[in-house]
């Protein structure tokens, strides 16, 4: 350890990884609604006769068409219903980890009394659930982060509001200015004592299990189809195909409601998959050691977190594409690249896939995960041959940290109208179905 400041930063990096890389069962936006509903039920102590759910436009977008684990159904009303009947209010993003078939049947009976609408709020991630029965009511609000409960009310009395309640731990919102650089991340991943980061191996284990499940056939079956084409000799059994197969299979299973958790990144299972499975595939293909895989995963997940800190929690930019940039960096290192080549890889990816929109969570996410994975491998292969997008083009800069900041600016400022129109289109579709 060269100095005290570095030791403190490395400690911060480890804390950040442990906070942002956590298990999550099901797509995280519907799970926020389920978690709010589970806490409402805990406060109310009985089954409600009327439930109102309000969400931000972005949460609506990511919850409209995605599968809810263990139900075989999609959508925010379903998430709220099973949150009431079987949600564990203390389980965070694994709120539905003990859901039973009987509780799913109970939830179906609640669907007619649940109304979901979009609320005009400043937070892009916002979920509010109000449950009522026989003159009693309970209200729970989650905002900023998927499990950050900021308000609990029972019969109009505030029980907890932000940090005011003793014993209630709430994660602070992230700083707008990331306290890290790519060079610092790479140095940490390669130099930190292995014993301090071996916990990241759980990401490989957990997301590999999800990929194995996805290969059985979920959602759009991208992973299964790609595997079948390898067997038919229509696709090569190479690094890029293996990475696409594993990544898309895990996403297939996750978005179709498989009852297996994903190791998430920055509050998203697909981001966790995109930051994990391409690296696992590369390590397997290249016969990397366990230590190399561990360090590569740390690099990938920290890069994904770093890039995400420049963006809103939810936006019009596909975050799986940016999380895969972490995988690209790690694969470049596994292929023998140094910091310069790792920088080239990220610049290549930003020059390639930075325009992929997020039009809500759903089965098509696995297509975007596989596309971003292929871009990660392609950009890595270019980078180790010192080929890269020149700084004279688009939003790419010679300074990779500046390029990342430019991407964040595009997401936070340039794509606001895009986000609004995506949400408007999706709301119009839903209203058309309701008529």
From Swiss-Prot:
One GO biological process term: L-cysteine catabolic process to pyruvate
Sample GO molecular function, one term: L-cysteine desulfhydrase activity
Pfam families reported in the protein's UniProt record: SDH_alpha
Protein's name according to its UniProt entry: UPF0597 protein ASA_0240
Family from the record: Belongs to the UPF0597 family.
Disulfide bridges in this chain: none
InterPro entries according to UniProt: Ser_deHydtase-like_asu, UPF0597
């Amino acid at each position: 350890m060269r100095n005290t400041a570095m030791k403190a930063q490395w400690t911060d990096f480890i804390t950040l990884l442990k906070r942002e890389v956590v298990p999550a069962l099901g797509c995280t936006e519907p799970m926020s609604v389920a978690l709010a509903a589970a806490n409402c039920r805990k406060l109310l102590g009985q089954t409600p006769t009327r439930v109102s759910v309000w969400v931000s436009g972005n949460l609506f977008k990511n919850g409209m068409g995605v599968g809810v684990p263990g139900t075989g159904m999609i959508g925010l009303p379903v998430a709220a219903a099973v949150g009431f009947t079987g949600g564990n209010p203390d389980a965070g993003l694994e709120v539905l980890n003990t859901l039973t078939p009987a509780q799913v049947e109970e939830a179906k009976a609640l669907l007619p009394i649940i109304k979901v609408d979009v609320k005009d709020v400043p937070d892009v991630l916002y979920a509010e659930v109000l449950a009522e029965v026989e003159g009693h009511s309970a209200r729970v609000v989650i905002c900023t982060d998927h499990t950050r409960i900021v308000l609990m009310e029972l019969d109009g009395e505030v029980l907890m509001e932000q940090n005011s309640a003793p014993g209630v731990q709430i994660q602070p919102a992230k700083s707008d200015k990331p306290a890290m650089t790519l060079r610092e991340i790479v140095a940490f991943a390669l130099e930190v004592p292995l014993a301090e980061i071996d916990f990241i191996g759980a990401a490989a284990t957990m997301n590999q299990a999800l990929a194995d499940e996805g290969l059985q056939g979920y959602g759009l079956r991208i992973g299964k189809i790609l595997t079948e084409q390898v067997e038919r000799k229509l696709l090569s059994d190479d690094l890029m195909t293996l990475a696409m197969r594993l990544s898309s299979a895990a996403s297939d299973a996750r978005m179709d409601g498989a009852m297996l958790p994903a190791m998430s990144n920055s509050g998203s299972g697909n981001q966790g998959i995109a930051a994990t499975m391409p690296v696992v595939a590369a390590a397997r293909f290249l016969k990397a050691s366990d230590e190399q895989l561990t360090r590569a995963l740390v690099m990938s997940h920290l890069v994904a977190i770093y890039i995400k800190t420049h963006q809103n929690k939810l936006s019009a930019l596909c975050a799986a594409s940016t999380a895969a940039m972490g995988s690209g960096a790690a694969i470049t290192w596994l292929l023998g690249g140094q910091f310069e080549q790792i920088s080239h890889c990220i610049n290549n990816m930003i020059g390639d896939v930075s325009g992929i929109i997020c039009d809500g969570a759903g089965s098509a996410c696995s297509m975007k995960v596989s596309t971003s994975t292929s871009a990660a491998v392609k950009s890595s292969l270019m980078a180790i041959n010192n080929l890269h997008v020149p700084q004279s083009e688009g939003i790419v800069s010679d300074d990779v940290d500046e390029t990342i900041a430019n991407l964040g600016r595009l997401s936070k400022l340039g794509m606001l109208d895009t986000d609004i129109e995506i949400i408007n289109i999706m709301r119009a579709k839903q209203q058309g179905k309701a008529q």
